[in-house]
Amino acid sequence: MRGGKKGQQTAQKNRINEEITAQEVRLIDIDGEQAGIQSLKDAQTMADAAGVDLVEISPNAEPPVCRIMDYGKFIFEKSKELKEQKKKQKQIQIKEIKFRPGTDEGDYQVKLRNLRKFLEAGDKAKITIRFRGREMAHQEIGIELLNRIKGDLEELAVVESFPNRVEGRQMVMMMAPVAKK
């Protein structure tokens, strides 16, 4: 199924002009002033005289509320408002960085730089330490590594969860960015 322009499909369709079925309507004129209850014909004539549309704003009211306005401009303003609201919402993602107990200093610094980038962008970070083979016997190395990461990032992030034991063959620590003031 093919759709039209993105964003216009979800907008609630208001009935305009001839689509309105009520005999009487509560009218709001082009200046936003109450014009009282009018017959649909009179309201339509007033809208035509002004060169704009008669738009049903509240169809469930008794009688329905209609407004004289430029419908195209109304839709444009509504979609602009929705776009602004979407822009203000930030989707928080969880970024994962994997370490090993034997992660070398150079690799550690690169991974730490990436973690800083994620946290500064406002994303949460998941630090995973994976153990292989005999490394399982030295879980304290994993704890030391997590504590080192925690210390290096303490000005940027707070620890949400710190592992107190190994889950399977890995340890997982979650960090969230510190709220900016």
Swiss-Prot record:
Gene Ontology CC entries for this record: cytosol; membrane
Gene3D superfamilies for this protein: Translation initiation factor 3 (IF-3), C-terminal domain, Translation initiation factor 3 (IF-3), N-terminal domain
Single GO MF annotation: translation initiation factor activity
Record flagged with keyword NAD: no
Short name of any one Pfam family annotated for the protein: IF3_N
UniProt function note: IF-3 binds to the 30S ribosomal subunit and shifts the equilibrium between 70S ribosomes and their 50S and 30S subunits in favor of the free subunits, thus enhancing the availability of 30S subunits on which protein synthesis initiation begins.
Subunit structure: Monomer.
Family: Belongs to the IF-3 family.
Name of the protein described by the UniProt record: Translation initiation factor IF-3
Organism: Pseudoalteromonas translucida (strain TAC 125)
